[in-house]
Amino acid sequence: MDKSKIRNFSIIAHIDHGKSTLADRILELTNTVAARDLEEQFLDQMDLERERGITIKLNAVQIKYKDYTFHLIDTPGHVDFTYEVSRSLAASEGALLLVDATQGIEAQTLANVYLALENNLEIIPIINKIDLPSANVEKTKEEIENVIGIPADNAVCVSAKTGLNCEKVLDAIVDYVPAPKDADDNKPLKALIFDSYFDEYRGVIMLIRVFQGKLKVGDDFKFMSNNANYHVIELGVRNPKETKKEYLEAGEVGYVAATIRDAKEVHVGDTITLVENPALEPLPGYKRKKPVLFTGFYPIDTRDYAELKKSLDKISLSDSSLTWEQETSKALGFGFRVGFLGMLHMDVIQERLSREYKVGIIATSPSVEYKVVKTNGTFEMISNPSLMPDRTYIDHIEEPYIEATIILPNEYIGNIMDLCQNKRGIYKSLDYIDDSRSRLIYEMPLGEIVFDFFDKMKSLSKGYASFEYDLIGYKTSDLVKVDILLNGDKIDAFSIITHKDSAYEKSRDLTKRLKDAIPRQNFEVPVQATIGGKIIARETIKAFRKDVTHKLHASDISRYKKLLEKQKAGKKKMKMLGSVEVPQEAFLDILKTNVDK
């Protein structure tokens, strides 16, 4: 294959700017997919992606255009899936920067552009939705130049929906995206694993970009991170269905199957090389993103524990940012502590477990990872509130802080600044992009933004504000652990870590919701919220009262009193012996509301 005719590129865009639609047009114009087979969001294979209208998983497809070979690596646009974008960019030489002409540059567009620049990619601006009456092409070009700092004179103006000017995008890819550098078939093999998924019959399938050398069916290769050896049984390209080949050469993007059954053997970002003639140095990986949000996953039916473990194994194969470890809860039994990149990521994994793997789970209240510095000078990283040490051993607690960049219309600045202040934000700067939009920068605790910040920001700005963030480290905060007691017993699944100023309000809310969710017992049940043994909120679940006097004659007052006293004594004994059964529905209801809040 003539290496000068290969073009590897990704499409980067903010959510809803038309990225999947442009990918559909490219597939249609190049006859990669027959028009009769083409459906909207063709590369978004998950039902979840189609329903929500978002891209979650990256996808790679080979396209023939004139005498050129394109490899399009599709990427997600939501802030939670930045790690998928960075993997796509590591396998590309160029990026199409798609900007909606009616919305302009948004915060996540900016974040992805910086990723592309870090990877030294050629960026081609594409201005989309020019067919809409509200499109402002000139203003969008100005924003590309002023905010991002790249020239917009070669920007291609298109309507991905109608197909207007989309063939010009193909010519721009040929003209501006560079061919692969140092793509020599005769050098020792170096191929980057940028994604993987599981196939029941062939085991782990790896998506790779070959940077140098050649990989053939029958070759023995090894992973450079752990030296594990495997034998290639099948390889090929996706266009977009899998097409078998005898070999993959330098510059190509394709898939490899080697009957790998253990998902943990394959690390996305690893380099594969041949056993016989190995490369000396691995390829630089890509920037891995660490989970920022942690929650407990417990099977609704305890017999599904092994099934949940197997399902998490399979999902983490294609989602390298997902982390999990085993944990136990007195209230919920055996489960896993799972780490996510944000609320949408958590939501998607929960839904995938339910739909694809048919595993019903209870998810505990999400938490970030805190740094607990003890009085003896040591520290612990705690993501599970129930594992927080006793207050007497704690010197101080630090929580993760982020720098948030918010791009928004000027008329909503007051609303969004109020929201940031309420979330304990520290104002940093405000820049006016033009006469209608601004860039606002705040430092905020991560724990305040992972739950509902995104939704509140969208509703306060009528959907026009966009937001992206970077972790900047840990800062000391006045944090406390709130425990919930039911009839005097601590329920570890309901423990939360919160700021001292909001502890009372959250405790009142949680005890009230528990009172409403837990069915009445035969005895009175106190629901208490405590900080270090001190009760700060209480609700009482009233007891059922059986009418023990209904058979008595109205005038038999002494017998009447005797029966009531006997009932009272019985209830007292029951209360001492009785443990409160919390039904599954109550757990689901409380923890779901915790997430919603």
UniProtKB/Swiss-Prot annotation:
- Catalytic activity of the protein: GTP + H2O = GDP + phosphate + H(+)
Q: Give the UniProt entry's GO cellular component terms.
A: plasma membrane
Q: Name one GO biological process term.
A: positive regulation of translation
Q: Which PROSITE patterns match?
A: G_TR_1, G_TR_2
Instruction: Please list the residue ranges annotated as the tr-type G domain.
Output: 4-181
Q: Where in the cell is it found?
A: Cell membrane
Which residues, if any, are the signal sequence?
none
Write down the HAMAP family for this protein, in alphabetical order.
LepA
What is the protein's name according to its record?
A: Elongation factor 4
Organism of this sequence:
Mycoplasmopsis agalactiae (strain NCTC 10123 / CIP 59.7 / PG2)
The taxonomy runs: Bacteria, Bacillati, Mycoplasmatota, Mycoplasmoidales, Metamycoplasmataceae
What is this protein's gene name? lepA
